[in-house]
C-alpha cells in the first residue's frame, strides 16, 4: 500500500445511547470526541442511536404492527368529522 493515501485505521469506541452499551471496534471513522473506556485507555468516541444491542430485530423485542394501513386508520379516525354540525 502507498503511504499517506489511506485513512488511519485505529480502535474507535462506539456508544449505543439507547442501550448504554460500548463497542470497541477498529474503524477509519473520523471524530474529534474522545472517551475513556473501562480498560483505562482513551479512544475516539462516536455515539450511535441504534446498534445490535438495541435494535428490535437483534434483541427479539419486536412489536406487533396493526393490520390496517395508515389510510384506513385516518378514515376511521375522521369518519364522522365532516358530518358533524
Curated annotation (Swiss-Prot):
Transmembrane segments: none annotated. Keywords: Ribonucleoprotein, Ribosomal protein. It comes from the Bacteria. One of its GO terms (molecular function) is structural constituent of ribosome. InterPro entries: Ribosomal_bL28/bL31-like_sf, Ribosomal_bL31, Ribosomal_bL31_B, Ribosomal_bL31_sf. It holds the Pfam family Ribosomal_L31. Signal peptide: none annotated. One of its GO terms (biological process) is translation. GO terms for cellular component: ribonucleoprotein complex; ribosome. Part of the 50S ribosomal subunit. Belongs to the bacterial ribosomal protein bL31 family. Type B subfamily. PANTHER family: 50S RIBOSOMAL PROTEIN L31, CHLOROPLASTIC, LARGE RIBOSOMAL SUBUNIT PROTEIN BL31C. This is Large ribosomal subunit protein bL31B. It comes from Stutzerimonas stutzeri (strain A1501) (Pseudomonas stutzeri). The gene is rpmE2.
